[in-house]
């Protein structure tokens, strides 16, 4: 009985460690990604300031003709925030996933401990044949041990899958949102919404051939 209680306590401790370590690792990776994302946002925001190509405005200050800071000054550059499920939801779903493996492993081990017979020294050495009843119990006990190991492996696999795919989906969603925002910003620049020629001229550019005659009278 003491051996069974020791095994149950050890299994519970191992389960808590298995459930806690991946979460700590994922939390550290998420904090690192968020910090790198903030740094990348700052680099993108001020990337056009140092790309001087020789153009000057009316006051003689250098102006970048390729990159404008309209979206930066107006605060229109999108900030990508990765969504996460609440901590209680993640914990509850992990407990549900580990319930069957833990119960199965404990039950299988208790069955194996109950069924496996104790062999005599002569039977262990092979000098005496093992009776058929003991052979059947030994086979059932070994099968129960194999089932306990299988349930333990299932619990480890579910714990691993609970954390790893979520991280990859978060990174993919951030990359997709960032790519869409950059495409929209570039499209707006190409279509003339942030034309540097228009900004230096102080008004919209009038295409050739569309100039209207001005009445001077």
Curated annotation (Swiss-Prot):
Disulfide bond sites: none
Major localization listed first in the record, in broad terms: secreted
Region (Disordered): 171-217
GO cellular component: extracellular region
Keyword line: Glycoprotein, Secreted, Signal
Compositional bias ranges of the Acidic residues kind: 208-217
Signal peptide boundaries: 1-19
Positions glycosylated per UniProt: 191
InterPro entries named in the record: Dense_granule_Gra7_protein
Compositionally biased spans, kind Polar residues: 171-183
Subcellular location, record wording: Secreted
UniProt similarity note: Belongs to the Gra7 family.
Name of the protein: Dense granule protein 1
Organism from which the protein derives: Neospora caninum (Coccidian parasite)
Organism lineage: Eukaryota, Sar, Alveolata, Apicomplexa, Conoidasida
């Amino acid at each position: 009985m003491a051996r069974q209680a020791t095994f149950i306590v050890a299994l519970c401790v191992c389960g808590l460690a298995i459930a806690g370590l991946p979460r700590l690792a994922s939390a550290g990776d998420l904090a690192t990604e968020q910090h790198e994302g903030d740094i990348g946002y700052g680099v993108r925001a001020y990337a056009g300031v140092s790309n001087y190509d020789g153009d000057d405005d009316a006051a003689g200050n250098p102006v970048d003709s390729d990159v404008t800071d309209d979206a930066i000054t107006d605060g229109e550059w999108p900030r990508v925030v990765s969504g996460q499920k609440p901590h209680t939801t993640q914990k509850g779903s992990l407990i549900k996933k580990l319930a069957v493996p833990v119960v199965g492993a404990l039950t299988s081990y208790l069955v194996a401990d109950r069924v496996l017979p104790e062999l005599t020294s002569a039977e262990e050495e092979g000098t005496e044949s093992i009776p058929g009843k003991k052979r059947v119990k030994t086979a059932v006990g070994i099968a129960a041990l194999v089932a306990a190991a299988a349930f333990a492996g299932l619990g480890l696999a579910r714990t691993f899958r609970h954390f790893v795919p979520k991280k990859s989906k978060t990174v993919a969603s951030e990359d997709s949102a960032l790519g869409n925002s950059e495409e929209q910003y570039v499209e707006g620049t190409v279509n003339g919404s942030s034309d540097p020629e228009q900004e230096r001229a102080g008004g919209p550019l009038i295409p050739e051939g569309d100039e209207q005659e001005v009445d001077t009278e």
